[in-house]
Amino acid sequence: MFAKNSKAYSVYLLFRFVCSLAVSMSTVLSIVYHLEVVQLDAFQLVLVGTVQETSCFLFEMPTGVVADLYSRRRSVLIGMFLYGLGFLMEGALPWFATVLLAQVVWGCGDTFITGALEAWIASEEEDKPIDKVFLRGSQMGQIGGVLGVVLGTLLGNINLQMPVILGGSLCLLLGLVLGRIMPETNFSPAIEERQGLLKDFVCLFKLNLGFVKGAPVLLTLLAITLCGGLASEGFDRLSTAHFLDDTVIPVIGPLNSVTWFGVISLIGSGLGILASQLLIARMEKKGTVSRTSVVMSTSAGYILCLVLFAVGRSFWFMLLVFLLAGLMRTIKEPVLAAWMNDHVDEKMRATVFSTSGQLDSLGQIIGGPIVGLVAQQVSIPWGLVCTAFLLLPALFLVPVAGKKRD
């Protein structure tokens, strides 16, 4: 691999595979672990998720600034060590307080990686088509995620703490390996003359804000990201409940309801890997793809599949549209990231990508309670329909982004 491709590209693919494997292994049975080992009640479970999302939201911008001021490579390494520390803390110390603290630690680690990784590979591989790089990275992440789900499930049947601890250990090991092999040759700090961390942070924040305001395409793409965040939380939180409450899950041999969800996850990942490969093959044949068409069609397809999933009552029909909805998101995200990359100043890449991640988290924080309230007061299907409606503004924003020029 290292002989055929550049070192940075190979390291990027290795990172996406191993990191996804470790995180999937650690989290695949996290709710079961929290219920059976830590013995959390319903309120505590919700609080764990809230602390995690809030940590990601609060740390996203500061860590992006660190990556653009000091080093994207260093930011990724810090993130991996925080990932490992957070998972080890959660798995080794099964108490509510340490689980909450672990969410803060690995949530902070996630923000050190988000934005910095994309900015690092975009700078190191300026001559490669970034759409293909992001799609191939997404594909490797999905393959690692599938393996992580399988390993996590097998290990969890032995001991529920084991996959969390081993996943954390793998994150630490990956951090050590990256410290030896991860290059950084094209980085230049966003601010050459330093005035102290706080002043540098404020200065870069103002530069970033001014740049985004003066870039209409980027501003529109960030608004599309916010819409995606608004429409993701309801789908992620309510889809399982919709399967359990509004249809009959067939029992086929060993496939009970619990096993079915693992199988569905694996099928979804497999479809994502295949779709990414087909899109990469099309890019290699034609040289490029229309980002406007891809983002528009996948957004519209996601809305349609979500509505059909909400009104469905047949298990097989619901399974089909559920998988298609997930596929739409899998295809859209790397293409949207590549589109955004083309309108970002090189020195502020990590900060802008972190802003995108922050808007996605903000959308989830806002959209989740709205959809949850509708599901609680009316019904789960109506909550899912509400989720679809929250993405509708994106259908008007995508053509606008396609026509504008920075």
Locations of regions flagged by a protein language model:
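Juxtamembrane intracellular "pre-TM" segments in multi-pass secondary transporters
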Residues: M1-S6, I181-L222
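Helix-loop boundary and gating motifs at the non-cytosolic
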Residues: F2-F57, V217-S265
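Transmembrane alpha-helix termini and helix-breaking/packing motifs in multi-pass membrane transporters
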Residues: V32, E36, V146-G167, A241-I252, ...
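Conserved MFS/SLC helix-loop-helix module at the cytosolic interface between two early adjacent transmembrane helices
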Residues: C56-P94
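Primarily marks hydrophobic transmembrane alpha-helices of the MFS/SLC 12-helix fold
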Residues: V76, T292-V295
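C-terminal ends and interior cores of transmembrane alpha-helices
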Residues: F81-W95, A300-R313
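Cytoplasmic helix-loop-helix junction between adjacent transmembrane helices
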Residues: V104-I143
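Helix-loop junctions on the cytosolic side of multi-pass membrane transporters
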Residues: I165-G167, L172-R194, P399-D406
